């Protein structure tokens, strides 16, 4: 369990500060399950959801607090999406994290942020801003992967397409869903049903909401790019199949007269003079070669290939 006071900066503390002092407490789901006695949270701590139960980003408003969960598309050390639970009161912020991912984020806030009037709302704004601070770079990396896959398709290298394409579709969908849910959280903070924040502090959450919307639009563009890339791949597959069918059609067209010739002379009627003529076999061979040659010439003239 880690305590931080909110003043002109975020300051680590060894002990819990006074209830009237704005503060942040970081703990694990296991520590939360023991319902510890935390100053200023006696009546509200039980509303805090554990990180292990987090599945989506959400915010639930109550008369004396706001609580919810956050699930990020980025993965932790165990390969699972990063998740945390949170609770907000007028003077306290509770963060529940089982992956130690938020500890580095809080240290970054303590190192980089300076506030004239430190408050819970100001910390929350910077906390959520830090959550999405590097997301644009992550989306750009996804865009680069899409472009690389597109170049691969245009180069007719289609063998290793399906697996990375499926991964990209799932990843872009996860980011889009994340921003849609995070927008709902930002909306709950901006509406300030509990009256925890001043009008100027509500503007901060409005700014955060605008940024989330822009990131959601960016992720939607990536989803559309994936759909277009899938269409391009399908068009390339169709072109390849059409080329194969064209070759088969040409071969069939060229040798169809020979099939007729073989079927004709394969009947072996007694009255067929070519069967007993000593030049019958060579003549049939020559006729077959001439027929194939004429068929090839016609196909070439018609630009069938």
Task: Show where each model-derived region lies.
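Peripheral, non-transmembrane regulatory/ligand-interaction domains of membrane transport proteins
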Residues: 1-191, 211-214, 304-305
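Hydrophobic alpha-helical transmembrane segments and their immediately adjacent juxtamembrane loops
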Residues: 26, 213-305
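Aromatic-residue hotspot detector
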Residues: 39-40, 154, 204, 269, ...
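Generic alpha-helical propensity signal that fires on short helical segments
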Residues: 104-106, 111-113, 145, 171, ...
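Hydrophobic alpha-helical transmembrane segments
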Residues: 113-116, 188-206, 223-238
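Alpha-helical membrane and juxtamembrane elements of multi-pass inner-membrane transport
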Residues: 125, 159-166, 173, 199-206, ...
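Alpha-helical coiled-coil oligomerization motifs
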Residues: 154, 161, 180, 187, ...
